[in-house]
């Protein structure tokens, strides 16, 4: 669910790890498939940095859970609580700013489409990209639908709002999504609860996928244009480029009628 969380677990003393000691469990091995990162500090002085790294990883990029597994003797000993101001995490590089060329391609595809639509997911809310989303929708006069987790990303009393799609969505939202020829999908993983049959969905339209997690790009749907980066930062770049192009659509689109 992309929820930031720190889970702290206890472990047998360091010297007994790997010896099948009483109540020992390989919690690191069990948790790795479902967490962003797992730490097991072996010395008391390693705890502050592990905590600092844990909170950083849980809250940056695509938010998610982090495990801190602390052996019993590490818990019982004393050490200075010096939290580092700077640290390095090998292999962890959260995406923030998008590739400008990709955003340009996304704009071109939207402008050249006859029936474009916006699908806003939960990532829009996590990134607090409310104003940017509304600006894009109003500038290009794009109807907006949301996933179940994206509900609230766009004002539902707005003239361009159609509400949520999917098996628990609105009929008019599902109808417009079915008829669209291009979708700007923002912060969504294309759950089957929202889009139904994956193959049928991607055959109908071109997909511009904007997401902070590169692992989501192309996972469930074939993507025509990928914009990898923080959703709010990516939409801000799109707003800026649209202003530079002086793009402004009107409400006389047959698609909107």
Provide a role label for each language-model segment.
Residues 1-256:
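N-terminal alpha/beta PP-like core and its mobile active-site loop of ThDP/TPP-dependent enzymes
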């Amino acid at each position: 669910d992309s929820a930031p969380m720190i889970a702290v677990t206890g472990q047998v003393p360091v010297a007994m790890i790997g010896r099948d000691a009483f109540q020992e469990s390989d919690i690191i091995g069990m948790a790795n498939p479902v967490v962003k990162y797992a730490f097991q500090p072996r010395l008391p002085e390693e705890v502050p940095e592990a905590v600092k790294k844990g909170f950083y990883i849980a809250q940056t990029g695509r938010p998610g859970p982090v495990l801190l597994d602390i052996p019993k003797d590490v818990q019982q000993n004393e050490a200075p609580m010096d939290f580092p101001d700077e640290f390095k995490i090998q292999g962890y590089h959260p995406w923030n700013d998008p590739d400008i060329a990709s955003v340009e391609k996304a704009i071109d595809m939207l402008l050249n489409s006859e029936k474009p639509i916006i699908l806003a997911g939960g990532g829009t809310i996590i990134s607090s990209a409310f104003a940017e989303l509304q600006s894009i929708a109003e500038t290009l006069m794009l109807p907006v639908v949301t996933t179940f987790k994206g509900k609230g990303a766009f004002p539902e009393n707005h003239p361009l709002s159609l509400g949520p799609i999917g098996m628990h969505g609105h009929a008019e939202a599902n109808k417009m999504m079915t008829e669209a020829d291009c979708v700007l999908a923002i912060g969504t993983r294309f759950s089957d609860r929202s889009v139904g049959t994956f193959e049928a969905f991607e055959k109908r339209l071109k997909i511009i996928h904007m997401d902070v997690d590169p692992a989501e790009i192309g996972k469930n749907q074939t993507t025509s244009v990928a914009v990898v980066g923080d959703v709010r930062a990516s939409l801000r770049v799109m707003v800026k480029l649209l202003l530079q192009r002086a793009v402004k659509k009107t409400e006389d689109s047959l698609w909107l009628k």
